[in-house]
């Protein structure tokens, strides 16, 4: 809904950067999820597993467990995002070998080495999808004098997002408001521009990977 609501409606993010930003709204959101998976009254409340960034504090973890139980879960368990990502792609996390996981989420990115069923080393930092979107917004405004919203920035990222030059350039047409006169305007933007826009952020991720591998 970001970028698509009228001016009299506010879009709220219950979770931000991987942790609870609004406790009450988070509780309502989880309660709604539980009703969808368990609509009939009288059935036992479900057990819930929630992913959290590897770098969150014990206080932040406790808040997630508490809000999930208050929302109606019988039991709440946490799993660190890199571990969930490893399981999701089919890795045998119990093998006596190291697996490097890079999980670029919305608010945070997670880099972890996993072996023998545990996380050996990890780094959690706030350079991820949301930062990509705001960086694209700033780039388009500065280079093209065009004002776009988060919805358009995400569309650009998904359709032509790249971190290195492609063999064949990809371009799309986007709409926005002229920053000089406020009038609607369309422009063509290409993947090479996104490579330029995201270069610094990508380099930050690369540096974090180097630290983990040292």
Question: At which residue positions do the language-model features occur?
Answer:
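Nucleotide/phosphate-binding catalytic cleft detector across ATP-hydrolyzing
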Residues: 1-104, 112-214
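Conserved Rossmann-like nucleotide-cofactor binding loop
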Residues: 107
């Amino acid at each position: 809904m970001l970028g698509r609501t009228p001016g009299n409606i506010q879009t709220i993010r219950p979770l931000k950067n991987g942790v609870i930003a609004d406790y009450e709204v988070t509780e309502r959101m989880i309660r709604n999820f539980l009703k969808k998976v368990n609509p009939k009254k009288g059935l036992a409340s479900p057990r819930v597993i929630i992913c959290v960034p590897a770098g969150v504090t014990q206080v932040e973890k406790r808040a997630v467990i508490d809000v999930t139980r208050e929302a109606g879960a019988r039991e709440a368990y946490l799993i660190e995002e890199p571990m969930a990502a490893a399981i999701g792609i089919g890795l045998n996390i119990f093998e006596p070998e190291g697996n490097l996981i890079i999980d670029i989420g919305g608010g945070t990115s997670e880099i972890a080495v996993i072996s023998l069923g545990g996380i050996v080393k990890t780094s959690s930092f706030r350079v991820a999808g949301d930062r990509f979107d705001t960086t694209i917004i700033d780039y388009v405004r500065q280079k093209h004098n065009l004002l776009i919203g988060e919805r358009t920035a995400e569309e650009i990222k998904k359709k032509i997002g790249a971190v290195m030059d492609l063999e064949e350039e990809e371009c799309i047409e986007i709409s926005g408001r002229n920053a000089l006169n406020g009038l609607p305007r369309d422009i063509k933007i290409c993947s090479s521009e996104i490579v330029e826009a995201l270069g610094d952020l990508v380099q930050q991720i690369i540096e974090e990977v180097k630290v983990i591998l040292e």
